[in-house]
Amino acid sequence: MELELRFFATFREVVGQKSIYWRVDDDATVGDVLRSLEAEYDGLAGRLIEDGEVKPHVNVLKNGREVVHLDGMATALDDGDAVSVFPPVAGG
């Protein structure tokens, strides 16, 4: 199946595009996608996953819903889903 992956801020700089289309197995989960991104892009290695979960302060959304409110890393994906990945944001 094919997903649209959307990147923001520093993650967009690493990937070099604001969105890409990514082919995954039909039974892929959010965790599978994040692991494959860390393997594909050196600048993302160690920045998405910590202790088997989405790293604290990183926001991952499936079709606009935060995956921490779904099934986390085990969130199932469907063909055509949009997965958005936001780096930690600080402000004042």
Swiss-Prot record:
GO molecular function, one term: nucleotide binding
Keywords recorded for this protein, A-Z: Isopeptide bond, Nucleotide-binding, Phosphoprotein, Ubl conjugation, Ubl conjugation pathway
Assembly description: Monomer.
Deletion consequences: Cells lacking this gene grow similarly to wild-type in the presence of either DMSO or oxygen as the terminal electron acceptor; thus, SAMP3 is not needed for DMSO respiration, suggesting that it is not required for molybdenum cofactor (MoCo) biosynthesis. tRNA thiolation is not affected.
Name of this chain's protein: Small archaeal modifier protein 3
Native source species: Haloferax volcanii (strain ATCC 29605 / DSM 3757 / JCM 8879 / NBRC 14742 / NCIMB 2012 / VKM B-1768 / DS2) (Halobacterium volcanii)
Pfam families, per the entry: ThiS
Protein induction: Up-regulated by the addition of dimethyl sulfoxide to aerobically growing cells. These conditions also increase the levels of SAMP3 conjugates in cells.
This protein's record includes keyword Ubl conjugation: yes
Protein role: Functions as a protein modifier covalently attached to lysine residues of substrate proteins. The protein modification process is termed sampylation and involves the formation of an isopeptide bond between the SAMP3 C-terminal glycine carboxylate and the epsilon-amino group of lysine residues on target proteins. Seems to be able to form polymeric chains with itself at Lys-18, Lys-55 and Lys-62, similar to ubiquitin and other ubiquitin-like proteins. SAMP3 appears not to serve as a proteolytic signal in the cell to target proteins for degradation by proteasomes.
InterPro entries tied to this protein: Beta-grasp_dom_sf, MoaD_arc-typ, Mopterin_synth/thiamin_S_b, SAMP1_3, Sulfur_Carrier/Prot_Modifier, ThiS/MoaD-like
Cross-link (Glycyl lysine isopeptide (Gly-Lys) (interchain with K-? in acceptor proteins)), chain numbering: 92
Residues annotated with Glycyl adenylate modification: 92
UniProt-listed Gene3D superfamilies: 3.10.20.30
Position(s), cross-link Glycyl lysine isopeptide (Lys-Gly) (interchain with G-Cter in SAMP3): 18, 55, 62
Post-translational modification: The C-terminal glycine is likely acyl-adenylated (-COAMP) by UbaA.
Taxonomic lineage: Archaea, Methanobacteriati, Methanobacteriota, Stenosarchaea group, Halobacteria
